[in-house]
Amino acid sequence: MTQIFHSMIAAILGISEKQIGQTLSLLDDGATIPFISRYRKEMTGGLDEVQIESIRTHYEKLKETAKRKETIVATIREQGKMTPELQKRIDDTWDSTALEDIYLPYKPKRKTRAEAARQKGLEPLATLLMLQREPHPEQRAAAFVKGDVKDADDALKGARDIIAEQVSENERARNMLRNTFARQALLTAKVIKGKEEEGAKYRDYFDCSEPLKRCSSHRLLAIRRAEAEGLLKVSISLNDEECVERLERQFVQSNNACGKQVAEAVQDAYKRLLKPSIETEFAAQSKERADDEAIRVFAENLRQLLLASPLGQKRVMGIDPGFRTGCKVVCLDAQGNLLHNENIYPHPPVNQSKEAFAKLQKMIEAYKVEAIAVGNGTASRETEDFLKRQTFNREVQIFIVSEQGASIYSASKIARDEFPEYDVTVRGAVSIARRLMDPLAELVKIDPKSIGVGQYQHDVDQTKLKKSLDQTVENCVNLVGVNLNTASSHLLTYISGLGPQLAQNIVNYRAENGAFASRKELMKVPRMGAKAFEQCAGFLRIPNAGNPLDNTAVHPESYHIVEQMAKDLGCSVAELIADKELRRKIQPERYLSPTVGMPTLKDILQELEKPGRDPRGPIKVFEFDKNVRTIDDLRIGMELPGIVGNITNFGAFVDIGIKENGLIHLSQLAQKYVSNPNEIVSIHQQVRVKVLSVDTERKRIQLTMIGVSG
């Protein structure tokens, strides 16, 4: 069975069976996706995280189908209806829909009209009608009038119920109807009378009809949400007459009285059984496709957000701005530890701008502040302006930082554990400052669904969503790597091979014994076994370690290779890392072995070139247009700087410094055809846009990147 799975997955993904087998073997052995992708390239043929995840997903689906087959076979055997031909059909079928069609006639049912008719002894009459040879079925039906069967008409009705069920369970009929649905089904939405005002935000769908196959995921999810809120009536429709006609061509063989009885049964089968069944099936399938697309978009947005450029280890002031309640100010050291907090009131109604400046000046001097992070919520622009009007004694850079999810973090157990003696306002300001220093380390503390980059995230399959987002966070954390001596337990949790318990054990060990001096010391951590060490070691960094390789992505299992390279060149490992000319003399082919191939050697050489390199780019200072404060300040044709805040499959939302974000539709991202917005823009990218239209009533702003100067 395993080999069959390998062949099927290989055919679906276009990856060799050997790669599939090796990858699944590693996964079964407990290896994580980041570990396999980074350190087992020879075994997988260089597959990336997405390919490995896809292999795992397909394998799990096939195992589920195999388990379902076992249940189906057991049920049919219990009924004594299994035949060699039926067994072969089940064995050969791996499509879940086709499998359920095979099983349908044997599936135990609640008491249906057909089952009730069978219990009245009407199945022989149904068989007689289906033969369509009897010229006077009413006369033959009279023989079945007994017990609960009142008269011949009642007998014929029961027989038609049996035929209707047989028609609805016929594989050919179901497939015909599926094909018709796939080609012709229309998704129709209409506003429920009296709900026009309440459902104003769904105005685009008040009277819409479009082919289901062309309905984009975001439109489908929006329509389904409006339906769930009781604002729209939604249906899937198609040409009923054509469908019934095609069914009659299949089942009605004679133009006689029996044929008319069968035709009546076919019409009933379509209306009462087949159409609702296939409609439900298509609704579920289209919802699943929309969910998968929305989850894919969310995961990609999250990946980009987590990999946003960090300011790094600098002394930062964080400001959570506000008007009446003032601005909460915190000062952090280069490691993100809280040194000081207080409030300032530079804005109305208090207007203590002079006092606010004096306090800021004092804090900047006292804590040697190098940068200021301002939250992008209420009073953000006013606070930014206030800061830029001041002349401080030290040079400080000012950054606007997304507050999305900061309030969730500030009230969370993680925040309470970190700052038990401070209130939520202090914790929120600390989170804003830390997001500037290292977005990844801070954002992993927040449920990704609270970060605000999802598309209809509450409407999609929550189990699938969580699995995808957790894997995305894990991939990002391991791509960057973490400092073993400063990482929080929450960040360590996402490191390959660790999890919550080992992560906490590492933090506890650090607290009791001081900083780790080497990766080897990890083996002293309670419950750290050889397997966990193998999986995690390469992703944990120790700056200033005795062995410089402990601060690189070179895995300890490969240290001997680097040591041999250094020995062959007559130098130390540290000298090899420091001297470009020495590295140029390395001949990688000399270090090939049955277990170490060129992919691993190339990775090692890249690490020696830039030890512990951070894949995230340098951070850039950004300024919004000073003349734009509200949506009323916008004019068509106006060009503005902006920051991409969210990406969907229909375009990108851009923060232009006001309360409302503007949308760059897919068609307005570039002169060329764009199928995926991520080809053009990414989360946090700084862009220049032009205003196309402004709808102040609905708070909608349309933007373009086409024909923009500079």
Please provide the spans of the model-predicted regions.
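Low-complexity, acidic/Ser/Thr- and charged residue-rich accessory regions of DNA metabolism proteins
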Residues: 144-146, 150-152, 208, 247-256, ...
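Short, ordered loop/turn segments at secondary-structure junctions
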Residues: 39-41, 130, 239, 321, ...
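Long, charge-rich intrinsically disordered scaffolds of nucleic-acid metabolism proteins
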Residues: 98, 399, 405, 410-480, ...
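C-terminal accessory/binding modules appended to enzymatic or scaffolding proteins
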Residues: 14-15, 309-311, 474-508, 626-670
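Duplex nucleic acid-engaging cores and interfaces of nucleic-acid transaction enzymes
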Residues: 51-54, 61, 65-318, 324-422, ...
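Accessory alpha-helical DNA-binding modules that contact the DNA backbone or grooves
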Residues: 32-33, 44, 48-113, 117-150, ...
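A glycine-rich phosphate-binding loop feature that marks nucleotide/adenosyl-phosphate handling sites
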Residues: 179-187, 319-323, 377-382, 401-408, ...
